[in-house]
Amino acid sequence: MTFIPVRTIRSFKSSLLASLGIFVCFTLFNCLAMPVISFDTIAIYVEYLAIAILILLYSGIVNEEWSKVNIGFLISVVVVMLVMGCISTPMFHAGDFRDQLNIEVQDSTAFDENIHQIPLTKMNRVSEETARDLIEKHKMGELSQKCELGKFTAQVITADFKINEFGSDEEIHFIFKEQPIWVAPLEHSSSWKAFRNGVTNGYALVFQNDPSKYFLVNKVNGKELQLQYLESGVLFSDLERHLRINGVDGLMDDFGIEINEHGLPFNTVSLLKNNIGWSAPKVTGMAIVDVQSGEITRTGIEDAPAFVNRIYPERIIKNHISWWGEYVHGWINLTDKDRKKATEEDLEVVYSNGDNYYYTGIKSWNSKGSTLGMMFTNTRTGQAFYYERTGINENDAEHAIASHDLVRDGIRLNTLSLNDALFYNIEGIPTYFSTVIATNDVMPKYYGFCSALNKQIVGVAPSLEEAVAEYMKKYLEVQSKSQSDIPSEANLVEQTFTVSEKVQEGNMYIFRFKETGTQQFYAFSDILNDVRWKAAKVRVKYNAESSQKMILMSGFEIIE
């Protein structure tokens, strides 16, 4: 009869217990930390390395010898990590890193074709910080004892739905047509409250273009909201864990909430895959999660629902722009030849013709002031447009607005402050726009415009219409003084046109005529009184040699 040595049995039991312990430890680690188990990410190799070290330590302590197999496994993992780490750097792939940005470099004349002129009614007058203050100070009330506002997402939405706010029986009917809004979920304020309450019951909705319209939504189309799958959720209500255990693998980024055309909230998560070793992640699609039911929909970039605005995370686009500007002549560029960089650390989100764009100015590598051009990247498609046109940066524009007579003293005495300048196409002019608020209030007190091409062209006023009128008047004054646009009598012509559109902005009137297509003509009522009156046909005197997209009318006569 053959007996198994006691030492062998003990060794087997020790090995079994050690294996079970390692399995339990890494199961808990994966469940809690939720690393990405994918061979193109570093997380799996970190686990392999940790397992190899534990096995090696076990074999040395229990068996009192260092196994060559275990040592070989450990060395193999370390070598793979070193090699992958090296080839994942721009040192070896500078050109590939630079090519991550899907960019079209265009002449400044194409600016108006892609970044459309924005109606004043669509301009963002409410910053993210202001939106948060409006809800927290005027809407949260006792709700703040059990939940808090989550991250706001900028969205442009076309929708039709009805809401009720917390504690209100009044039903509010929203009909949106490309309406820019801020949306944020109510999140659990602590893990204990997430355990106890299970769900939160609403989301915040703030109009970007109207600071008087902000809502804390509790019911949509008569049904109370039950938000369960949140970033602040615990255990299987944790949003990322919910995605992982339902088979959504790979890298994830930019967790946010957007509402669909029926007013219902959805978590939108960008899915990514590393493109160069462990680096340069690229967007491959979206995971869209019903916050209430937990239903998950995976889509490609082109197949994403229309209500999803933000597919490309800001962090990814910032990296792409940085690589595009830095590695223009490879990784080594001792003289910084042709290198460029963004003017600001963070990107601004601006609206144009139904789409949102990340915006940043672009300047030379060592520049501290003027810009070389403007970069716009579609938040949904990732398509970037770079317009080569010198101008001023956001800080210079904010300083120019802050130096205006109306706000200078308030800024100096810290009773007024400026929100970050946003970039817009105002009647064909690249323009920075900012709201001026009192330090003890969140509502805009003044509105300011500054040309991105000339910081001397500034308009500030208590109303948006007055501010843009002052700005345009200043612009036309500067334009008329420029050498190329001085209207001489020889260049002035008179023509009869049919009015197709007239828009009033303060005391400025903007005309489009059937005979001139998209060309715009301008006049001020304090100079040409007749522009105020309705007319079908007019005789206009203007500078025929002007190359500007906006032409100042020197004469205006109503015919019929």
Please give the residue ranges for each predicted region:
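Soluble extracytoplasmic regions of secretory-pathway and membrane proteins
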Residues: 3-560
